[in-house]
């Protein structure tokens, strides 16, 4: 759903900030 997509995007953003490649 929409909330799932938003949550997934936020999770990916945070993960990218925590472990930048």
Curated annotation (Swiss-Prot):
One of its GO terms (molecular function) is nitric-oxide synthase regulator activity. One of its GO terms (biological process) is negative regulation of nitric-oxide synthase activity. Expressed by the skin dorsal glands. Keywords: Amphibian defense peptide, Secreted. Signal peptide: none annotated. GO terms for cellular component: extracellular region. The keyword Secreted applies. Its main location: secreted. It is found in: Secreted. The keyword Secreted applies. It comes from the Eukaryota. Coiled coil: none annotated. Has no antimicrobial activity. Strongly inhibits the formation of NO by neuronal nitric oxide synthase at micromolar concentrations. This is Dahlein-5.2.
